[in-house]
Amino acid sequence: MNQEIMNLFNPTTPAQVFDQIRISIASPEKILSWSYGEIKKPETINYRTFKPERDGLFCARIFGPIKDYECLCGKYKRMKYKGIICEKCSVEVTLSRVRRERMGHIELAAPVAHIWFLKSLPSRIGQLLDMTLKDLERILYFEYYVVLEPGLTDLKERQLLSEEEYLRAQDQYGQDSFTAMIGAEAIRELLKGLELEKIDAQLRVEMAETDSDIKHKKLAKRLKIVEAFRFSGNKPEWMILTVVPVIPPDLRPLVPLDGGRFATSDLNDLYRRVINRNNRLKRLMELRAPDIIIRNEKRMLQEAVDALFDNGRRGRVITGANKRPLKSLADMLKGKQGRFRQNLLGKRVDYSGRSVIVVGPELKLHQCGLPKKMALELFKPFIYSRLDAKGLSTTVKQAKKLVEKERPEVWDILDEVIREHPVLLNRAPTLHRLGIQAFEPVLIEGKAIQLHPLVCAAFNADFDGDQMAVHVPLSLEAQLEARVLMMSTNNILHPANGQPIIVPSQDIVLGLYYLSILREGLPGEGKVFGDLAELEHALFSKVIHLHTKIKYRWDSLDDEGKPYQRLIETTAGRILLGQVLPKSVKLPFEVINKLMTKREISSVIDQVYRHCGQKETVIFCDRIMALGFFNAFKAGISFGKDDMVVPASKWKIVDTTRTLAKDFEQQYNDGLITHGEKYNKVVDAWSKATEEIAKEMMKEISAVRKNASGAETQVNSIYMMAHSGARGSPAQMRQLAGMRGLMAKPSGEIIETPIISNFKEGLSVLEYFNSTHGARKGLADTALKTANSGYLTRRLVDVAQDCIITQDDCGTSLGIKMRAIIDAGTVVASLGSRILGRTAGEDVRDPQTNEVIVKKGQLMEERDVEAIHQAGVQEVKIRSALTCELVNGICGKCYGRDLARGTPVNHGEAVGVIAAQSIGEPGTQLTMRTFHIGGAAQINEQSVIESNFEGKVVIKNKAIARNGENHSVAMVRNMVVAIVDPDGTERATHRIQYGARMHVDEGDTVKRGQRIAEWDPYSRPVLTEVEGTIDFEDLVEDQSISETLDESTGIAKRIVIDWRSTRGGADLRPAIVVKGKDGKVLKLARGGDARYMLSVDAILSVDVGAKVKPGDILARISTESAKTRDITGGLPRVAELFEARKPKDAAIIAEIAGTIRFGRDYKNKRRISIEPMDSEEEAREYLIPKGKHIHLQDGDIVEKGDFIVEGNPAPHDILAIKGIEELAAYLVNEIQEVYRLQGVLINDKHIEVIVRQMLQKVEITDQGETDMISGEQIDKIEFDQLNAKARDEGKKIATGTPVLLGITKASLQTRSFFSAASFQETTRVLTEAAVNGKVDPLEGLKENVIVGRLIPAGTGASMAKLREVAMKRDRMILDEREKQATIVPPAAPEAEPLALPPVE
């Protein structure tokens, strides 16, 4: 009954339950079926009566009444006349809400083309008809006729005729001998006449016959569109409109303003133009006006409809009265202000407030201070209902009055309402999920929100005027989710890396650091205390100091967990700190019996969380905070000018470096080094000096001094602050008391003259000026960075939003191999840190005993990782999101541990969004700059290799020569030195630079820190491999070589110049050859002549006739010139990698293993081919610009994947040559490199999730006997499905190769058109989806938000699962009933249906 009454009030049909949404092109019949009537007049409302005009754009007869249950003339009012149509004004009596739902239409007097299908590239109409857009526009806008039926004439079908040609043809052949038309009618006829099946077959034949790649692609594109129309049920002629739909009037309102004027939606103007022109055209046609006038009117109608659908896409933009472009239907959807992003994905919420935040140190971790005034406003409805329930008010109005007067009982009720009702606090910008957390409110006086100090790191909040917003979760479910999932106490670990994010900072750290200092020689040293009271008494009466070394009887737990006491040596302060540590076997006193820096505290919190659980951690954090604040206040640490200690040796170091710089200047003047080398050396010298001064300063500041009585004095305040991690860093201290050092120009280059002063001494005017560049550039960068970083996050979220954990285990045996990452001999990321919290892909075995440490499929916890480390395992295969075989989402095993909880990941976890946030959130900390070489980038080039381990040397691909100076020199590029420990495990491997001096040989034993090899970081040598006499080839003065006199030194050096640009130099091939005694060019051991090709900018080191030995340098290339490429760093580099762009100077990678051969050169390209080792394969050829330095010689042997030309490799090449695993490793490492430089920790799995999303498409190489088209890109899932189908039917299956798409492209090509349309290029996405008749299965998060459902992640996922189970059960019951009905003969009345609960 209730339902029926409700239906009375709700005349519109409720939204049906649907599983998917399909988009297609609307046919004229469909548009008419939506419509409630035709709009014949352009009028909107009557300006005297303000009533809508009949048949106008706001007509009440078509769209429904303006007031609820009241017709326009007022004859019928009230509910009882519901559904009656007034005979006077023809308006149906119903709810006025129907004006938001009912549509109208306009019958067009002449068909017009839909601009989206015409102009949105590629033009769908053009591709179907195989005509160019230019020709189509000529026909549509009445410039040319098109021949439809040539009849028996000489004209061709679809030939374009101008006006004169048309008339001439009519005269020549007679009027009825052929059919030609003009305008949209013509196109409509052409589209109508298409026989898609025939075209399809014809295209397939043509594709099979063609050899040209370009033609094949063109045919494939057309075939795709033909198939789209064949299979989607769309008819091509529907792309030409004969009826235009009119959207409901309440969606394009006309609002009266003060002063009798009206504000109107732009759509009304656009519709008005269409109606006016349409009516005029109808009238002209009735009047049989001349053709030219009618044609002009048709063209104007076409333009009006174009403007309505997409203003400004063709011709000039139509503007309103105030010269502002009118917003068309397409603009309503597009961009940040469009329907998708403004209203469907981003909604404003009620029950919210915002205020400034202040610190609340006395709060517990789960609390926040909420101003009373604010709470009263936010919780009003709850207060009203509670007042009513208590009988303090009878009506809402009365309750309102009570609340407004702020009566005492209202405050009591507010207390009750707020108890255990969490609120959400949010700080913009919300860069990751920790930007919104739930707290229990505590009422406070004042108007500022109080925030707990420990959650500041998660919100990235500080108290310099930041504001935060408060939201109230209303429903019980919302409160439950807030408490269980979003409470600040449930978010202790950072989702990006699994480290604690509830970490003390600043004052707290300083207080704890001060508390845990140990100083020798203080009064009372060595005393023994039995319990805390005794200790506190001694402290209070100043018998001992906090820092005194004492002994204390500590209550510990043994391995069985039984309590016992032991004597420990510690300080009084550390005992106080130990009191807050939870008692656990795993947490002995040693955990805190050391100097507590920020990092130490973080690790203690981590251990407490791992061993004692969440509740203990929260209590521990709160206590530690109170302790820290209290002791920071007690210590009273501050610093004065004298705390900045300038090292005594500063000026000595500065003077030495000055002389060094002068020497380099002199060497340059004498012509021994080039300008670039001088610059590099000077910059190098000064950065070394700065480092040294900083070291000296740190030594002096951190020095332990003793007073007269032999007790250690308190350590320097500045040092305490920096060392503890409370504030400041060694880099900042260096500027305060050391020397400021080198500064960068705005271009990123480094200025050669450093700033020698520090801030204590003060800068000179010139020094200050030099330092302003960097400071100003920093500010400009920050502004740009924020926008760029936000856009990167948005693209990442979009590409990964449908990545959800949907199952426990996909059962794959694939995985990726993990090793420690070693850079320049130091371990940057240990194996343990990379495999922690991942699932083992196979059994991990001890290399010595071969026993299994971790079983296959086991999640590796801390203890497993420790065991793997102890066993010395070098490589572990783990499961990865990249190799997960689920169709939708990822399985729990492949993902591993949920980093924010430290447990296996739950079903429904939105890992894609978490990954995107984890990568995007630190984006603002990355630099924007592209490093220009010639500065900082060279300084961190390393030029020696030292061993980090002890062991024996094993050399792979060994080729060492002794040169003329009797040094051992590396002669090949792929030589690797490995250090092996006694039991044969490889401890480290080092790739040796070509031309490096070797300090060790095969079989040598090395100690830690011993040099293995060194080389000149500033130049690359060309070495000879044979002994003989030098001769030059094609080194012609002023054509390929020039003697440059260094202007400042007058010394000549010979440099190879660009010979292509000189006259007569095009065919030269400059080289140095080594000849034997007989005057013939010597042969090399690997075949080929001893001829060394030179590249541009090589500096010769030998003369004609010089005698050389193997390993001698013939020429050198200054790295400055070999490396003029920019190193893209920071954010742009991350974006470049995720977008899978080809780097500017991309490396050329060998596709096969083989021998290098130099072919005949072209004018400005050099031809290199690789002869394969395997005779089955074909040789590969590469063309390389001549200016590029090729460091390979004829006859060198390269492996598959080696670089032929140095540079950053293009990710697509890596995928094609080395496969998915290598590509993933490359992308993960490169992206991590950028973040590591900034000290940001991100777990590899996040990057893997994004890379998985980039690898979802397959390019078809051979279509087999399937419906796929070779050369097209198709979803991996679809590819597998179609192949499975073909396999079942016994047909030949298609083959394909994986393609890597950039994140923007991948987002636009997702299976969901809703998601793609709301991301970018809305028009294009919707056009394509409509043509293909795409179905959106509503699987991702975005699509579900858009259609207003729970997202299929988190709680939404479990709800969906329950719904599925329920539907299955219902189906079973119904099937059972049907079965029963068929079995039992109808004659027997006593047969009851199955006794099952009724189905609602």
Swiss-Prot record:
<feature type="binding site">
    <location>
        <position position="462"/>
    </location>
    <ligand>
        <name>Mg(2+)</name>
    </ligand>
</feature>
<feature type="binding site">
    <location>
        <position position="86"/>
    </location>
    <ligand>
        <name>Zn(2+) 1</name>
    </ligand>
</feature>
<comment type="subunit">
    <text>The RNAP catalytic core consists of 2 alpha, 1 beta, 1 beta' and 1 omega subunit. When a sigma factor is associated with the core the holoenzyme is formed, which can initiate transcription.</text>
</comment>
<keyword id="KW-0548">Nucleotidyltransferase</keyword>
<feature type="binding site">
    <location>
        <position position="810"/>
    </location>
    <ligand>
        <name>Zn(2+) 2</name>
    </ligand>
</feature>
<dbReference type="InterPro" id="IPR045867">
    <property type="entry name" value="DNA-dir_RpoC_beta_prime"/>
</dbReference>
<protein>
    <recommendedName>
        <fullName>DNA-directed RNA polymerase subunit beta'</fullName>
        <ecNumber>2.7.7.6</ecNumber>
    </recommendedName>
</protein>
<dbReference type="GO" id="GO:0006351">
    <property type="term" value="P:DNA-templated transcription"/>
</dbReference>
<dbReference type="Pfam" id="PF00623">
    <property type="entry name" value="RNA_pol_Rpb1_2"/>
</dbReference>
<dbReference type="InterPro" id="IPR000722">
    <property type="entry name" value="RNA_pol_asu"/>
</dbReference>
<dbReference type="GO" id="GO:0000287">
    <property type="term" value="F:magnesium ion binding"/>
</dbReference>
<dbReference type="InterPro" id="IPR006592">
    <property type="entry name" value="RNA_pol_N"/>
</dbReference>
<keyword id="KW-0479">Metal-binding</keyword>
<keyword id="KW-0804">Transcription</keyword>
<comment type="similarity">
    <text>Belongs to the RNA polymerase beta' chain family.</text>
</comment>
<comment type="function">
    <text>DNA-dependent RNA polymerase catalyzes the transcription of DNA into RNA using the four ribonucleoside triphosphates as substrates.</text>
</comment>
<feature type="binding site">
    <location>
        <position position="89"/>
    </location>
    <ligand>
        <name>Zn(2+) 1</name>
    </ligand>
</feature>
<feature type="binding site">
    <location>
        <position position="466"/>
    </location>
    <ligand>
        <name>Mg(2+)</name>
    </ligand>
</feature>
<dbReference type="GO" id="GO:0008270">
    <property type="term" value="F:zinc ion binding"/>
</dbReference>
<feature type="binding site">
    <location>
        <position position="884"/>
    </location>
    <ligand>
        <name>Zn(2+) 2</name>
    </ligand>
</feature>
<dbReference type="InterPro" id="IPR007080">
    <property type="entry name" value="RNA_pol_Rpb1_1"/>
</dbReference>
<feature type="binding site">
    <location>
        <position position="891"/>
    </location>
    <ligand>
        <name>Zn(2+) 2</name>
    </ligand>
</feature>
<keyword id="KW-0240">DNA-directed RNA polymerase</keyword>
<dbReference type="InterPro" id="IPR044893">
    <property type="entry name" value="RNA_pol_Rpb1_clamp_domain"/>
</dbReference>
<keyword id="KW-0808">Transferase</keyword>
<keyword id="KW-0862">Zinc</keyword>
<dbReference type="Pfam" id="PF04998">
    <property type="entry name" value="RNA_pol_Rpb1_5"/>
</dbReference>
<dbReference type="Pfam" id="PF05000">
    <property type="entry name" value="RNA_pol_Rpb1_4"/>
</dbReference>
<dbReference type="InterPro" id="IPR042102">
    <property type="entry name" value="RNA_pol_Rpb1_3_sf"/>
</dbReference>
<keyword id="KW-0460">Magnesium</keyword>
<dbReference type="InterPro" id="IPR007081">
    <property type="entry name" value="RNA_pol_Rpb1_5"/>
</dbReference>
<feature type="binding site">
    <location>
        <position position="894"/>
    </location>
    <ligand>
        <name>Zn(2+) 2</name>
    </ligand>
</feature>
<dbReference type="GO" id="GO:0003677">
    <property type="term" value="F:DNA binding"/>
</dbReference>
<dbReference type="InterPro" id="IPR007083">
    <property type="entry name" value="RNA_pol_Rpb1_4"/>
</dbReference>
<dbReference type="InterPro" id="IPR012754">
    <property type="entry name" value="DNA-dir_RpoC_beta_prime_bact"/>
</dbReference>
<dbReference type="Pfam" id="PF04997">
    <property type="entry name" value="RNA_pol_Rpb1_1"/>
</dbReference>
<feature type="binding site">
    <location>
        <position position="73"/>
    </location>
    <ligand>
        <name>Zn(2+) 1</name>
    </ligand>
</feature>
<dbReference type="InterPro" id="IPR038120">
    <property type="entry name" value="Rpb1_funnel_sf"/>
</dbReference>
<feature type="binding site">
    <location>
        <position position="464"/>
    </location>
    <ligand>
        <name>Mg(2+)</name>
    </ligand>
</feature>
<dbReference type="Pfam" id="PF04983">
    <property type="entry name" value="RNA_pol_Rpb1_3"/>
</dbReference>
<dbReference type="InterPro" id="IPR007066">
    <property type="entry name" value="RNA_pol_Rpb1_3"/>
</dbReference>
<dbReference type="GO" id="GO:0000428">
    <property type="term" value="C:DNA-directed RNA polymerase complex"/>
</dbReference>
